[in-house]
Amino acid sequence: MRKKAVTVKQIQDLDKVAIEKVGIPSLVLMENAGRAVAQEVFKRIKGIKKPRVCLLCGLGNNAGDGFVAARHLIEGGVKASVFLIGKGSGLKQDAAVNYQIFKKLKYPIKEIGARQPLPLEEVRAADVIVDAIFGVGLNREILGPFRNMIAAINQAGKKIIS
């Protein structure tokens, strides 16, 4: 069966219509997206005793989806390792809101700076990796710790949800 794909512009237009014309707050869209990611992870780890999930978040709104997914996974009893590539102070808008919610719940999150080692052990030990580093709007070359992290994810040979 052939599946149709949507373009970046179509996705952005759908978000814009949902927010501006329908009136769905962007924070609600992020919550729904993150919950959907968590539900997909739950499907993929079904039957695994003590599943481990590694969530890798960038600094854009995609990170917010990752924080929401991580919250739902942790609340569902999953051991989730959450990494932010950068500093929490670099997050904006809805991603920053969900980062603060995550922190207020005292869930662990590790910030990875340019000079810090990548969490390769956690990536390799995970049953599922959630890539919340970049979203559909990425339009530049990927450099530095982001590039290295993506290479590590691809080499891990694990189930990846992005």
Predicted regions and their residues:
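Glycine-rich phosphate/dinucleotide-binding loop and adjoining beta-alpha-beta core of small-molecule
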Residues: 2-6, 46-58, 62-162
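Positively charged, low-complexity intrinsically disordered leader regions
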Residues: 1-50
